[in-house]
């Protein structure tokens, strides 16, 4: 038989034995269950599935509503200096590190560290705590966007006028274009805009503080339920379904962003808005807060230290060149952030010109941009209903794929702890439904009349930059100084066929830990207690609760170290050495002999063991 025919036979053979059986989770093989082995792990159907899933996961709301405002606030074009320093010194190296760890170990965010360095398994648990808390409150934004989308299907947008039941006598419509003198004469009085009253009085029904939760907002609760149902059905069949959903959710927002960009650039006042966005103020670089904002924005926008990128990477084939795609995805992420600034600030410049105010008076970040500034802007445009629908569909899709990718990362990490149980039959689907239900019930605390205060508390503390910097530091330390960056480069070379440039391992060993440490220290030094809308001050007990949320993830790293040392027998130095030794060589050689390419580090009883046969995989 010719060599080509032999290779085709091997491909057909392995394609058949990896085919899912009816009624089983994807990747479950009958022989695995018969022999009591963990079911076969799923793999991405194609390269584009992985690329779009990662793109959808980390190109999200922060790119559209956070980066442009930070750039404007922190010196315009000058902000790009610390941004790119953190990008190449921290963001890209940690992003690639997490993806390649998942690919190298074929494990999720927790069990990958059990293989790499058991003493640092707390890194995985810290990531899961962060992403679990993030999944509770991030989806609330999508519930708000869903509500606004439904409200947009009206001939007259409900936040355009002051003639509704929720409006107060202080509500003042934008009459600037018709009567500039009327606006000027009333600008000093205590008036509010209809869009602000719609947001605070209709959507949120905002109470006076966090200690007055008030009644449940059933309209928002139903929107939240609908978003959770969509999220569940996007991931319930694993990466095979997720990889297909992102073909729409990850690409359509870019098309709509392009439409909004073109529309914004054609509005009067757009040039002034872009000037405010990019005009460099080098003196702002003397402020440590600028560097803190740059560092935290990088870690937020790249969705690192959450376990999600590790989980997505774990579904790659071993010989997949993820380094190439990680670099391209990094360009896509930062490029989207930069271009979004033109789309947003061109419209804010138009608003400022129409109202006759400085752009600083209309520039907003976060929910203020999405649910106050932009809705107000569309009321000033022709065809306001069309632009409102377009914007909130984009917002919903940007957040939706980020949400279900983060949930997928959480599920993958937890399922990998008990694969024999949770990958069998429909156990995985039931487990996903349980996680979604529990998270939905916890999220109901944020759709009450005082829910906005709870949301801000979670947003400020639970997944704060301090937590992400803490996890990133230990990730780099464990790989560079415990496992060994050169050893890890050997594994990367075995996977992708060449060694990446040395800047990656230098970043893991020195640059990234230094950046994380400096940013971590300055974040604590510059810490300011949380306030809402710069007016409401949170009570002491709420601040304490916020710090408990932050520490709940950070404490995992030292706590797991202590537990592992206590559970291991022998003298302290022997236990320490044992827990610092990678687990994957013996385990892969014995349990998955031949399933992984040969590695010189695979030793069993002090003898090297090569695979006995070859599994042929189709390159992505």
Curated annotation (Swiss-Prot):
GO terms for cellular component: cell projection; plasma membrane. GO terms for molecular function: gamma-aminobutyric acid:sodium:chloride symporter activity; taurine:sodium symporter activity. The modification Phosphoserine is found at residue 322. It is a multi-pass membrane protein. It catalyses: 4-aminobutanoate(out) + chloride(out) + 2 Na(+)(out) = 4-aminobutanoate(in) + chloride(in) + 2 Na(+)(in); taurine(out) + chloride(out) + 2 Na(+)(out) = taurine(in) + chloride(in) + 2 Na(+)(in); beta-alanine(out) + chloride(out) + 2 Na(+)(out) = beta-alanine(in) + chloride(in) + 2 Na(+)(in); hypotaurine(out) + chloride(out) + 2 Na(+)(out) = hypotaurine(in) + chloride(in) + 2 Na(+)(in). It comes from the Eukaryota. Residues 143-217 are extracellular. Its main location: membrane. It is found in: Cell membrane. Residues 29-42 have a biased composition (Basic and acidic residues). GO terms for biological process: amino acid transport; neurotransmitter transport; sodium ion transmembrane transport; taurine transmembrane transport. Residues 15-42 are annotated as: Disordered. Coiled coil: none annotated. InterPro entries: Na/ntran_symport, Na/ntran_symport_taurine, SNS_sf. Keywords: Cell membrane, Glycoprotein, Membrane, Neurotransmitter transport, Phosphoprotein, Symport, Transmembrane, Transmembrane helix, Transport. Mediates sodium- and chloride-dependent transport of taurine. Can also mediate transport of beta-alanine, hypotaurine and gamma-aminobutyric acid (GABA). Belongs to the sodium:neurotransmitter symporter (SNF) (TC 2.A.22) family. SLC6A6 subfamily. This is Sodium- and chloride-dependent taurine transporter. It comes from Bos taurus (Bovine).
